Amino acid sequence: MSENRTRFRLDQRRAPIYEALERFRQMRVVPFDVPGHKRGRGNPELTAFLGQQCVGVDVNSMKPLDNLCHPVSVIREAEELAADAFGAAHAFLMVGGTTSSVQSMVLTVCKRGDEIILPRNVHRSVLNALVLCGAVPVYVNPEVDKRLGISLGMKREQVEKAIREHPNAVAVLVNNPTYYGICSDLRAIVKMAHDAGMLCLADEAHGTHFYFGGGLPVSAMAAGADMASVSMHKSGGSLTQSSLLLIGPNVHPGYVRQIINLTQTTSGSYLLMSSLDISRRNLALRGRQVFHQVADMAEYAREEINAVGGYYAFGKELCNGNSVFDFDTTKLSVHTLDIGLAGIEVYDILRDEYDIQIEFGDIGNILAYLSIGDRPQEVERLVSALAEIKRRFRTDGAGLLSQEYIDPVVAASPQEAFYAPKKSLPLRETEGMVCSEFVMCYPPGIPILAPGERITKEILNYIEYAKAKGCSMTGPEDPDILHLNVLA
């Protein structure tokens, strides 16, 4: 703990929201406010399911507990502690998931007609924000690893070219890392953006642990980025839907708060906020040790899975100094096509036959998300199951597709296409038309098609193949994705 104590200005042993809730619990306040379950008394089934400890602190904003929309006491203290722990100028507690963090980032820096430079393999929340604000994407289409079929990071020269050709762009957005653990050269991209008078934003939905792990890729704040969206619930241990928005010294926190309050709830969940508070404390005090163990577990799993044969659990050997500048070694991503199975097929078999739930399976890969709650015995069970799946279900792989990412042809801005007059056509009749809605596999939530992109035969083949293999498809108005909305 002494090493950690030297890293922080504030007392990271504190958890102000949690402490305030504990004080409130002892006060025995009579509730004539919302929520209507009145500390669980009005909904005994819910109380029996979640427990009195939980529903007893599902409370509304009040003076002793502060207000998320305008924090002045315990929430403000919790945000100051989070900023200190993550090396940011300011931090905001977010209760709408990292989707709300990402959208707040984009809405802070972009207005209608502004250009923003970004990779096309972004989460849908980024493109949702462009629909809302009317900004225009300047895509840096990433390279694809031919063996794995996955998109890589942005090359430095690609970003430099985009900045040179679009000098009026307001920001560059970077994935740090991608879902698969791929990192771009963030420090170099931050410098290029700043030299051109642009801000640099980082989607760090999968990079919470970068702030607390030795030997892991550089975090956005350490690289000098201006804003970063951090999914504390993914690898940091907080409750699902809780997140952080971090900002650097070049961004005005008061304006960011106004942007957040445009879309975030006025009834912030104290369950989510206290989970952020407690998890931040845990990471500040023990994060380095814990994530060192997580990285060791993932490395062990990679070695064991590769020893099985047929699978390829990839890691730092992908690094090439540019489009794969670094790799997140806690990510256990496994290529499955060489055993004749799509990633989504292995995903389904693991759940249905072995009671193992992994993060996702796509066309050619699976991802097992290792974090602070995993233990070696579960890793052993996963390795054993994969070995048995190879023995029981291996095929010759005839007819398998390999490529995850297809470069889009952009014909209109996301906002223009989303709100334009549209018509619904059978899927196969949409070739050559401009899409007006999203189509994606979820997870990972990276659009196959976004509003404003031209529909190609290759994309239609991919959609039909993904549906046939059992990928969970979301986005279109037609839930069966037999029809797509296109510009009229």
Task: Spell out what each predicted region is.
Residues 1-73, 444:
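N-terminal "arm"/small-domain region of PLP-dependent enzymes with the aminotransferase-like
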Residues 279-302, 378:
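Structural signature of PLP-dependent enzymes
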Residues 300-475:
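Conserved C-terminal alpha-helix-loop-beta "cap" of PLP-dependent enzymes
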